[in-house]
């Protein structure tokens, strides 16, 4: 007998995403917490974006809200478009919204918007590479986008080391590894070459990125959490744990390519969570983490019992709403 799956309507989830985008952006703009006001460590692209926001602060907030809606709908549709899950689900939309904006936000909206857009394009290209084409062009494009992230956010520089290992783990081919490494380092090489053409040292941008990785920011992860935030994170972690367990144990209803996508995103999620241990970490990392979480967690809603999944989902939304209100006071 087929397992019953609750079909959440696209209209309802879209309205939820819009409400979350508007509410969280207004709240962080009008009543930011101390942890949200912590500036990101200046990077080659991130510094430019921070400078732009100083000139257009209101437009930056609006851009972030629109970008959140756009990429939220996009990442939610990946499962349907590429048939990642055994049944139809677009639950990646609310999961992305909650993780990206309802736990701890940031006031650097221009940086958040560009991070979200680049990460979405990388996730989309990587999913297309694994599920459909298996062409080097899509793998190269995904790694190219991921290689831009350290130029925007300082702690993401650790991806230069971690991503080749992840690619080798899910695609045991030296050709894939060579393409991934070359594409991943291309944005950094371009910045170094540009600096050399301008009369500077060729390796100066790379040295700057390394020093930025170790620069201490004023953000403290545990100090940014309240009781409701801890509950919200706990609910999301339970969903993640169930989805990962299903990925490992369910070998019949999940396609082999889908399992590769879920495995890659689960490992990437672990790496991104580990970036909070770096001294340069800020709350902007939640935007990056939201993408692999939004790809992995929908399996939880497809394969687990309806009563359990709906209860956790409603508790998550309730905790997210209460957390947004509490952070305003």
Show the residue positions of the predicted features:
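Membrane-water interface signatures at transmembrane helix termini and the short loops
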Residues: 245-305
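Membrane-interface alpha helices of multi-pass inner-membrane proteins
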Residues: 138-152
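Transmembrane-helix signature of polytopic, membrane-embedded enzymes
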Residues: 75, 79-99, 117
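Juxtamembrane membrane-water interface segments that cap and precede transmembrane helices
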Residues: 39-55, 206-230, 242-246
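Perimembrane helix-loop-helix junctions
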Residues: 159-185
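Aromatic- and kink-enriched transmembrane "portal" helix at the membrane-lumen/periplasm boundary
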Residues: 93-113, 125
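Membrane-interface transmembrane helices that cradle and orient dolichyl/undecaprenyl
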Residues: 121-137
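Transmembrane alpha-helices of multi-pass, membrane-embedded glycan-processing enzymes
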Residues: 63-74, 115-118
